């Protein structure tokens, strides 16, 4: 215990969403492996209890990770989860500020040296400032999306408005223009989820507070955007440290943050398939398509002659939504699961392509696994990520423009895109581009690579008491 109390202690605070928990927990494991103590904090609901059950987590118990340790803490936010994001955020901020302060006090014999949050809990920066603890942020979207929010907040270019909803946004980095339905949709005045954009903008307002903005990307992938933002905001320390899931592969640890136990025989089933014969399908944890769109996708797969591994999650508890139903023929031809270890699935040679909602975690995992993507974005950063995969990274094909498109993509179009991504010259081109990005990603996290160097510099600051004291005096 004496040795553990002498290790530098970092506290990570995550918004309660799988797409936020996964990358922040990966970061936590990598930090811990360098010889630090990491306390990972999120709420009991809606995911904390499920995480415990799926991963046998014990609150407050230190588990060894590399040279250090990691533990979990969960707190009640007093909110019954429904579809009201505003109420969730208000409740989360009120309870979160109180509970994080209590946790910092609880571990005063292992003083918290740094607070790290993701962008959906921007108030963590305020707590750090109040307690005079240095802070950092993990940005779990692309640097391009960060730039879009920054440009919007500072009114550097014109964005769509209620009177001019179809403005094209000009940006000084690739792809140079973003159509009105290609910007992060939370910034569009017609978005029913604009309050989510408001939360992210609260983090943009606080970009001057953290001593480091860690970005889940890598220099080679978004070089011009990262360089542009570094020049535009010289007072902000932008550090691309991704892909985190590739970096985390080197750590031997059974710590996971999944909200469901993954299907145990996915890989065995893939082993029984021919190379490049399976379409992997997942729309993340929150995107929930209409049943008639699910029907069209299912019949499109059947018409293509390909097999599929489809992650089909039940609706979140508390939401009045009927579970999806698939044709029996598809269930016989493919494999339907509620959850799987996506990074292992994407790395399997049987997987030909990925039909994805284009969340950034999925985008990074596909790019760094060398797998082409059929883009079916819904909202938020997904619509922007799709543009980059199709037009900039050149590893994707478009199947949808997003939920605002308000159309059901027919089965004929689904089958056509599936075959285009798996057979012929275009398929070869997509896979070759994806292979190149995979190599770039591996180089970035290898010893001496751009992400590895950025991450090591960040850890060196966490470990060095003098550096952290100086940072604290500045903030």
Curated annotation (Swiss-Prot):
<feature type="binding site">
    <location>
        <position position="362"/>
    </location>
    <ligand>
        <name>UDP-alpha-D-glucose</name>
    </ligand>
</feature>
<feature type="binding site">
    <location>
        <position position="381"/>
    </location>
    <ligand>
        <name>UDP-alpha-D-glucose</name>
    </ligand>
</feature>
<keyword id="KW-0808">Transferase</keyword>
<feature type="binding site">
    <location>
        <position position="380"/>
    </location>
    <ligand>
        <name>an anthocyanidin</name>
    </ligand>
</feature>
<dbReference type="InterPro" id="IPR002213">
    <property type="entry name" value="UDP_glucos_trans"/>
</dbReference>
<comment type="function">
    <text>UDP-glucosyltransferase that forms glucose esters with phenylpropanoids. Glucosylates 4-coumarate, ferulate, caffeate, sinapate and cinnamate.</text>
</comment>
<dbReference type="GO" id="GO:0050284">
    <property type="term" value="F:sinapate 1-glucosyltransferase activity"/>
</dbReference>
<dbReference type="Pfam" id="PF00201">
    <property type="entry name" value="UDPGT"/>
</dbReference>
<feature type="binding site">
    <location>
        <position position="365"/>
    </location>
    <ligand>
        <name>UDP-alpha-D-glucose</name>
    </ligand>
</feature>
<feature type="binding site">
    <location>
        <position position="342"/>
    </location>
    <ligand>
        <name>UDP-alpha-D-glucose</name>
    </ligand>
</feature>
<feature type="binding site">
    <location>
        <position position="357"/>
    </location>
    <ligand>
        <name>UDP-alpha-D-glucose</name>
    </ligand>
</feature>
<feature type="binding site">
    <location>
        <position position="360"/>
    </location>
    <ligand>
        <name>UDP-alpha-D-glucose</name>
    </ligand>
</feature>
<feature type="binding site">
    <location>
        <position position="20"/>
    </location>
    <ligand>
        <name>an anthocyanidin</name>
    </ligand>
</feature>
<dbReference type="GO" id="GO:0050412">
    <property type="term" value="F:cinnamate beta-D-glucosyltransferase activity"/>
</dbReference>
<protein>
    <recommendedName>
        <fullName>UDP-glycosyltransferase 84A4</fullName>
        <ecNumber>2.4.1.120</ecNumber>
        <ecNumber>2.4.1.177</ecNumber>
    </recommendedName>
</protein>
<keyword id="KW-0328">Glycosyltransferase</keyword>
<comment type="similarity">
    <text>Belongs to the UDP-glycosyltransferase family.</text>
</comment>
<dbReference type="GO" id="GO:0047218">
    <property type="term" value="F:hydroxycinnamate 4-beta-glucosyltransferase activity"/>
</dbReference>
<feature type="binding site">
    <location>
        <position position="361"/>
    </location>
    <ligand>
        <name>UDP-alpha-D-glucose</name>
    </ligand>
</feature>
<feature type="binding site">
    <location>
        <position position="382"/>
    </location>
    <ligand>
        <name>UDP-alpha-D-glucose</name>
    </ligand>
</feature>
<dbReference type="InterPro" id="IPR035595">
    <property type="entry name" value="UDP_glycos_trans_CS"/>
</dbReference>
<feature type="active site" description="Proton acceptor">
    <location>
        <position position="20"/>
    </location>
</feature>
